[in-house]
Regions:
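Terminal amphipathic alpha-helical/low-complexity segments used for targeting or macromolecular assembly
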Residues: 16, 32, 52, 64, ...
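Flexible, glycine/small-residue-enriched loop-and-beta-strand segment within the central core
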Residues: 1-66, 77, 82-83, 94
């Protein structure tokens, strides 16, 4: 897991989270982007990961992101800042989008479907 928090920003990870291998969580773009007047237009922003979140293999969580409680970020996804995010969902893709709702996850391997 690679964490990059700079310029007074923070990465907050809630309780009972499961983080896979090769994850990158960043509050910064690493380099400044400026408009033609010379003003920086890409400030660093906090990252918040809720409680009971599972982040899959090779995923990237970018500045300004808030990953909601009880959610899953699919393998190799890029989670970016979003205004429409909901708990108990699976987010996947580049950029990550909601692909399933009304879910939760457990570390337990359940062998049979519960009816």
């Amino acid at each position: 897991i690679h964490l990059a928090a700079v310029e007074g920003t923070s990465i907050c990870i809630g309780s009972d989270c499961m983080l896979s291998h090769d994850i990158n969580i960043r509050t910064t773009d690493s380099h400044s982007i400026v408009n033609l007047k010379g003003d920086r237009i890409n400030p660093s922003q906090n990252v918040n990961i809720g409680n009971h979140v599972w982040i899959g293999l090779g995923s990237v969580v970018l500045k300004g992101s808030w990953v909601p409680d009880n959610s899953i970020v699919g393998a190799r996804s890029v989670f970016t800042a979003s205004k429409a995010i909901f708990s108990n969902c699976i987010y996947a893709g580049v950029p990550a989008k909601k692909v399933q709702d009304n879910i939760n996850w457990t570390r337990e391997r359940i062998k049979e479907k519960k009816i």
